[in-house]
Amino acid sequence: MDQTVSENLIQVKKESGGIAVITINRPKSLNSLTRAMMVDLAKAFKDMDSDESVQVVIFTGSGRSFCSGVDLTAAESVFKGDVKDPETDPVVQMERLRKPIIGAINGFAITAGFELALACDILVASRGAKFMDTHARFGIFPSWGLSQKLSRIIGANKAREVSLTSMPLTADVAGKLGFVNHVVEEGEALKKAREIAEAIIKNEQGMVLRIKSVINDGLKLDLGHALTLEKERAHAYYSGMTKEQFRKMQEFIAGRGSKKPSSKL
């Protein structure tokens, strides 16, 4: 049975089947973030990590925007004080979450919203979605990773253009650049995100967590060290398995092999 919890303007809905949906719910302000919302968002992602009923998290925004950035009417409270605390930093908590995060992006993902999208593992965007970096326009120094992550995904030259001009990156262009996984028609982003989540949930969940971890950790290294990391973790994994675990793995593989392949993503 679906369960919905509302933490101020951050909604957490746990659905049957292992999917949780986190929604920024401030549509009249295009889901701009206050300091309190950031704290609640960080807590929501942190809670998902320890919740054994949740296997995949879908992250979205209500109304016609994913997130239009920080509420600049309360800029000082956002950028000063305990903003550096990792426990209340939503991007830090997203990066710490071991489970896959699928972003379902509708409308605007501006500056902080862009950075929240970058913290997702997989992105689905409606055709009208726009990603925009306005740090340079408003004199705000990036601190949630946009200046470093975007160039590693779409290339340095394109990232410089996006950040220095503050011009929007459309969903179609983002898809061609490999930043967005799937571009769908308006109103279809959540549906597609659920399809991807269901495909992930069909797999062996312990290995899903390990593969996400080794991919993300490997991205921080050069290729040679990343390949070494993979071998080390594979060796540790197989060396630590008991005969009973190997038997269960073989049973799982045999059971999966008897099923028809899933439809193409």
From Swiss-Prot:
> Molecular function (GO) terms listed?
enoyl-CoA hydratase activity
Which GO CC terms are listed, alphabetically? peroxisome
Taxonomic path? Eukaryota, Viridiplantae, Streptophyta, Embryophyta, Tracheophyta
* Localisation: Peroxisome
Q: Which pathway does the protein contribute to?
A: Lipid metabolism; fatty acid beta-oxidation
> What is known about what this protein does?
Straight-chain enoyl-CoA thioesters from C4 up to at least C16 are processed, although with decreasing catalytic rate.
Q: Where does substrate bind?
A: S68, G69, V70, D71, L72, A112
Q: Which protein family is it in? A: Belongs to the enoyl-CoA hydratase/isomerase family.
Q: Which domain of life is it from?
A: Eukaryota
N-acetylmethionine: residues carrying this PTM:
M1
- Site note Important for catalytic activity, residues: H135
Instruction: Please give a single GO biological process term from the UniProt record.
Output: fatty acid beta-oxidation
Return the PANTHER family for the record: ENOYL-COA HYDRATASE (PTHR43802), IP11341P-RELATED (PTHR43802:SF1)
Q: Which organism is it from?
A: Arabidopsis thaliana
Which EC number(s) does the record attach to this protein? 4.2.1.17
Q: What's the gene?
A: ECHIA
Q: Which UniProt keywords are given for this protein, alphabetically ordered? A: Acetylation, Fatty acid metabolism, Lipid metabolism, Lyase, Peroxisome
Per UniProt, the short sequence motif Microbody targeting signal occupies residue numbers: 263-265
Q: What is this protein called?
A: Probable enoyl-CoA hydratase 1, peroxisomal
Enumerate the catalysed reactions: a (3S)-3-hydroxyacyl-CoA = a (2E)-enoyl-CoA + H2O; a 4-saturated-(3S)-3-hydroxyacyl-CoA = a (3E)-enoyl-CoA + H2O
Which positions carry the signal peptide feature in this UniProt record? none
- Main localization is other
**Pfam family for this entry, one:** ECH_1
In terms of InterPro entries, this protein maps to: ClpP/crotonase-like_dom_sf, Enoyl-CoA_hydra/iso
